[in-house]
Regions:
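Polytopic alpha-helical membrane proteins, predominantly small-molecule transporters/carriers
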Residues: 1-250
Length: 250
């Protein structure tokens, strides 16, 4: 899903490297969030407050930077995944609404964010992300999509019985369908972009759980710090292949 160049947009080129880095970043955020809330035993609320502060600081730096910078951009993406992980776990477990309840709630918030963005700015295409207003909507929407992805990944892998390997296959298959739609249909590329962006999050979440969950539950039982190191290394490798020139997906 890559198209024409837009020098004004503050998002990276939507290439294969973009999607690989996105998945690696979401896996890093999943394991990082779990490391703080579980391994360090700080709890979901404290973890959410910590990562929310980091997320807000990263967004401020990203918005105040007047041109696209891949280091700032991908750090902000990782920040959205960590706060998304802890926020989803807080909603699902601490508030007791469960994976399905969390998925429904977060889906509603995501749709509302996209609708308000569309009504306010006239478009949700990423090549329009070139002002404080559009960037603010962009990062709020991404944060909701990352949070939804955590709940959706946990719901399919745990509650629905797919397991981690089954969840990985499910979301890879869904992304393959989106790719085919981008190649052989006239469906809006903006719609397909956001669909793919949303679904890469539960894929990253399931991969993260697969790395650090016990073998008895279908995981590899890596330590959360080891899984985070693995994810960071993978994210850094694909990040270097990310093109600096932004691109339109509309």
């Amino acid at each position: 899903m890559q198209n024409t160049t837009s020098a004004l947009s503050k998002v990276p080129a939507v290439t294969a490297a973009f999607w690989l880095t996105k998945i690696a970043a979401t896996t890093l955020g999943e394991t990082g969030g779990d490391a703080v809330t579980m391994s360090m035993d700080l709890g979901y609320l404290t973890g959410t407050l910590i990562f929310a502060a980091i997320f807000l600081a990263a967004v401020i730096v990203q918005i105040r930077h007047h041109s696209f910078n891949k280091w700032i951009y991908w750090f902000t993406v990782v920040a959205t995944t960590t706060v998304g992980t802890t926020l989803a776990d807080f909603a699902d477990r601490s508030l007791g609404i469960g994976y399905l309840g969390g998925t429904v709630l977060l889906s509603s918030l995501l749709v509302l964010s996209l609708l308000v963005w569309r009504v306010t700015c006239g478009t949700i295409a990423v090549d329009s992300v070139n002002s404080v207003r559009t960037e603010s909507f962009y990062w709020v929407t991404i944060m909701f999509s990352q949070t939804l992805g955590t709940a959706l990944g946990d719901w399919t892998a745990d509650s629905e019985g797919f397991g981690y390997d089954g969840g990985i296959l499910l979301f890879v298959g869904a992304l393959a369908v989106i790719w085919l739609a981008s190649r052989f249909t006239s469906i809006s590329r903006t719609v397909l972009f956001w669909a793919a962006f949303i679904l890469t999050r539960p894929l990253g979440a399931v991969v993260g759980d697969f790395l650090d969950k016990p073998i008895a539950k279908g995981g590899l039982e890596l330590s959360r710090y080891g899984a985070r190191f693995f994810s960071a290394a993978r994210c850094g490798k694909t990040h270097r292949q990310t093109r600096i020139i932004p691109t339109s997906v509309a």
